[in-house]
Amino acid sequence: NDLLYCVQVLLKRVPGALALAVTVMGTILAAMTGIIGASVTMMTALALPTMMRQGYSHAMSCGVIAASGTLGILIPPSIMLIIMADLMAISVGNVFMAAVTPGLTLAAFYLIYVATISAAKPSLAPPLPEHLLNVPKGEMGPLIAKSFLPPVFLITLIKGSILLGWATPSEAGAVGAFGATLLAIFNGRLKDGTLVEVCNTSAKTVSMIFFIVISATCFAYVYRSLGGDDVVEHLIVEKAGLDAWGMLILIMAIVFFLGFFLDWLEITLIVL
């Protein structure tokens, strides 16, 4: 809430300030959580009611939340990047560094699109209320510090420990959990039963991921042992006569098609 409010105030003179604030918040949450479900759920609970109250169109509101909320799949420390690095036997740090630019570029395109469509069609993104347009300048410093320092601290703690080689991804996850706990204590939001609920949710998520990993690995081993990959390679390379670029375009089209009915984890484990 503090972050969303702060970014709205900072962008108050820009068309579509609230939608831009939601996109910025989605980018920051992506760099903090590394998982889509957490970002989309949190943004829907925080941002959607606010956008509805301010008169944003349903299509605009849902589109902004869905697009910016899914940045967690690409911006480090994405769980998908960690699994991809393990499957391809590549350093997680290198994969993280390679994904930073595409992730931030996509976020920048979202911001440009939202600002453009808000300026072209003001009815989709009404101006901010008066109380947000008249925030005293003296309140901006403490507001920015309170809103941005905690996420910057957590992002630096997680990514810095990995990129500098101080911790493995698993250890960095523990560091991030410790940092998030400290922030919750500092903000007075660590209540009775919170840690138990977090541990239960984490255990369920990890169990589901491992079940999918085991199932997909068994499928891949059986498929390859029966010569399925050789058949596909023969059809694509020899029959279709595709070069490297043609192969890349075909694979991207297949992944795009699979995305309609499979989650990222299943696609990653099957395709790679």
Each PLM stretch: what is its role?
Residues 1-272:
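Alpha-helical transmembrane segments of multi-pass membrane transport proteins
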